């Protein structure tokens, strides 16, 4: 299975386990939505006030795993990169994931920051 197919499976699953490293070097894990997959990159977002955001900014090392209904398990590790053109990416995330409008209506969406994993393994 090639890298793009693995990323597409993660997008189909959508809710994936996402691990980071905290300021004490300990692993932390939570469920995060895969928002966009294209050009062998996985895109996601989080709010600036969350510990997850701080961990991404401080260290950036992440690991993602999920299993679909066919029992295909996908693992991805790499470095998360904060994207430039934040407004453009957040708007695109909301276009492709309209249910986000219920959680973050109107301009409240701009509390979020978009990231990608570009060179994962």
Residue ranges and their predicted role:
Residues 34-35, 87:
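A generic structural motif
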Residues 21-23, 47-49, 67-69, 77-81:
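Histidine- and/or cysteine-centered catalytic micro-motif in compact active-site loops
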Residues 12-16, 30, 38-40, 58-62, ...:
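A generic structural signal for short beta-strands and their flanking turns/coil linkers
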Residues 35-71:
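A short mixed-secondary-structure module that forms the rim of ligand-binding clefts
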Residues 75-121:
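Charged, gly/pro-rich active-site loop segments
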């Amino acid at each position: 299975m090639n890298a793009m197919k693995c990323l597409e499976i993660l997008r189909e699953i959508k809710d994936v386990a996402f691990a980071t490293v905290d300021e004490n070097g300990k692993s932390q894990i939570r469920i995060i939505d895969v928002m966009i997959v294209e050009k062998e990159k996985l895109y996601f977002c989080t709010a600036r006030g969350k510990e997850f955001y701080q961990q991404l900014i401080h260290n950036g090392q992440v690991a993602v795993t999920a299993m679909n209904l066919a029992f295909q398990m996908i693992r991805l590790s790499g470095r998360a990169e904060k994207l430039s053109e934040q407004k453009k990416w957040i708007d695109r995330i909301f276009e492709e994931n309209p249910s986000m409008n219920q959680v973050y209506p109107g301009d409240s969406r701009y509390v979020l920051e978009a990231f990608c994993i570009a060179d994962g393994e």
